[in-house]
Amino acid sequence: MTKDFLLRLTEEHYGAGAFHVYGRLLEEQRLVRGGPLLPMWHCTAALRRAFVEDSVLVLGCTNDSLLAHLLGATPVNPLPPHYHCPNCHRLIFDAHADDGWDLPDLTCPECGAPMAAAGHNLRSRSLIGESVVSLQVPQERFAPVCAWLRDYWAQRDCQTDTEPYSDAEVMGLRLTLPEGVQGIFEVRVLYPTDRLDPLPSDVPPLHTAYRRIKGMGLRLASDAWTGTERDAVERGRMAFEDVLTFREDVYDLLRQHTPPKQRRENGLPWAISEDVRKGKYAAQGMPKLIENYLCKQLRVPAHYIESMKHIRYLPKKGDCVGRMLFEGEK
């Protein structure tokens, strides 16, 4: 994956001079270089084309990658909210929007054509160390998709092995690339939306796209909307948009409370957000060291800390967006 390839990809989708886009691709190249993700994303894009794009739900770090999006491996655009003119490629970022889907209609100031709005502000940080592509498909497509994946890699002289946990509803396919690098495709049977928990009746109206994404987060999460959150919203201590409904909410909260001079990534905010996502503090309790860091050093409001202590699971934001696209709930 050369810089020339990334430049061509940028110009193909966003035109010449889209330096923000090119810079994001360079960052992702640095994070995935030498790993299996790039060939796995090419495979995922081919799989989506072979089985009709809207019958394959892509989850995990793939949704956080602009490179994966431009290759066709995921419909989720991880860039910050922005307008893009499909005619002349004028690109305008909006730092004040919560989500690209909420941007109002805009006519291109250069050529007068209607501009497209996109962008969900997902970070490439999740690509570090990843080697798993997660997919969900309807039950009737599960066996054909698994067979297609084995055949795809066999044609490319790659060894594949089925993981021991595989059964009638999940397949873990470990592949070994010719360079010796390994990755895993995890394919699961997709449960329809009606199998998800319904939204609590006391959740505020979801009148914006961003609120609907937050609502999907609550449906996928466990114990993210309890008395602590309801009380904080009702008393005006925080807006519904600030409720912790996916992993990125926790990370953004910690970064916002970190003094500017200390914001150089040290891994701790991301580690805490992952622990909250997996329900570690709900199961094992929050270590005093972490609680003091949040309370005394970052001065995170108490209601957020209480939320982190009882959340049993948070989805990734990209998975919420992907699920909405899959279900046609944009």
Map each language-model feature to its residues.
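Alpha-helical scaffold/interaction cores of sigma-54-like transcription cofactors
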Residues: 1-330
